[in-house]
């Protein structure tokens, strides 16, 4: 990384089928061992399942789920004078989106059932309804930040 100037962030390309950056970010997060075609198949099938189950636009439902799961604050460990404090820090929009996608996929993988596509579809539907594991993780993160509010002056 150059020391002279800050490197520019490269935005994700829009998805070829749905023409959505969010879908492409989701595909990248599902990706394992560089098999992008497999990841795309999983995500597209999940979006089709969402459309069948809810009779709504799957992209709008995905956006709603990501918005519901996105945390506003997170805690970071900060060492001050021999002890470590959990310091609450506000999250920028891009990082918030990445965290929410990561949580959606993490809790979809933990679900019971057959096929990653159906598990991902169910997790997205639950997140859009403000339920599911990813929503619990968001609430847990917010609770942690609220409990450590006293250390907010140790910001980075």
Swiss-Prot record:
Its main location: plastid. GO terms for molecular function: rRNA binding; structural constituent of ribosome. It comes from the Eukaryota. It holds the Pfam family Ribosomal_S7. Gene3D superfamilies: Ribosomal protein S7 domain (1.10.455.10). Belongs to the universal ribosomal protein uS7 family. Part of the 30S ribosomal subunit. NCBIfam families: rpsG_bact (TIGR01029). One of the primary rRNA binding proteins, it binds directly to 16S rRNA where it nucleates assembly of the head domain of the 30S subunit. This is Small ribosomal subunit protein uS7c. It comes from Emiliania huxleyi.
């Amino acid at each position: 990384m150059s020391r002279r100037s800050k490197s520019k962030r490269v935005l994700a390309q829009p998805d070829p089928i749905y023409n959505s950056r969010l879908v492409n970010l989701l595909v990248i997060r599902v990706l394992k061992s560089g098999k992008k075609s497999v990841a795309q198949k999983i995500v597209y099938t999940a979006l089709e399942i969402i459309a069948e189950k809810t009779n709504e636009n799957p992209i709008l439902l995905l956006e709603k789920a990501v918005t519901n799961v996105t945390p506003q604050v997170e805690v970071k460990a900060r060492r001050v004078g021999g002890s470590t404090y959990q310091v609450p820090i506000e999250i920028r929009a891009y990082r918030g989106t990445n965290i929410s996608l990561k949580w959606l996929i993490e809790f979809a993988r933990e679900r019971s059932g057959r096929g990653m596509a159906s598990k991902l579809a169910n997790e997205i539907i639950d997140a859009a309804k403000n339920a599911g594991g990813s929503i619990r993780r968001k609430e847990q993160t917010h609770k942690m930040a609220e409990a450590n509010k006293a250390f907010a002056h140790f910001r980075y």
